[in-house]
Amino acid sequence: MAKEWAATANQNGYANCYELECTDLKILDLNAEQFCILHWLTILLQNREFDTPSGLAYEAKAYLIENFKVDYSTYDAIIGYRADDSYFSFAQDFINGTISYRQLNNAMHLGKLGQQFVLKSRKAFSLIKFTGYELAEHTEWFDKKNKRDKSARREYFSTERNKRQRGDIYITQIMDEEMKSDDARLR
């Protein structure tokens, strides 16, 4: 996916190649069993600008930060969903009450948008080794990026956003019932 992000509509790019020995790193894996999608969303809310135009979105953001906050300050790296525009829009819809928790979970797998490995400590950066680079030709990779993103959004709008299911849990219910990360319904 690095090549998809490297190339622009009219210009080639480069994808750098690295090696990283992770043995001595403390890694937060947001895909681990003790976490749910709301932990990832909370980290996203803390680190990206989120438009919270409605009272619901503002309240949802505050609730998630209070109840699903992960102390990642001592970690060297974090593994989790990519925070690209597609995922960001799915998360925005969830805190605005447009989609359910189930729909958010499903949306995160549309278009195979992938995971990211984020280095965040000096220790992690000191262990990374540059091994080379690969050309990302814009004629191939920019098109792939657009197709992947459009595919995810098309799947989202044609299936997930329009299909409410009986028993779906929305952010309002999570807040009203004061659900926490150990709630079985969020697993």
Indicate where each model-derived feature is located.
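Short active-site loop/helix that positions an aromatic residue
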Residues: 2-11
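A glycine-rich, hydrophobic loop/mini-helix early in the fold
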Residues: 13-19
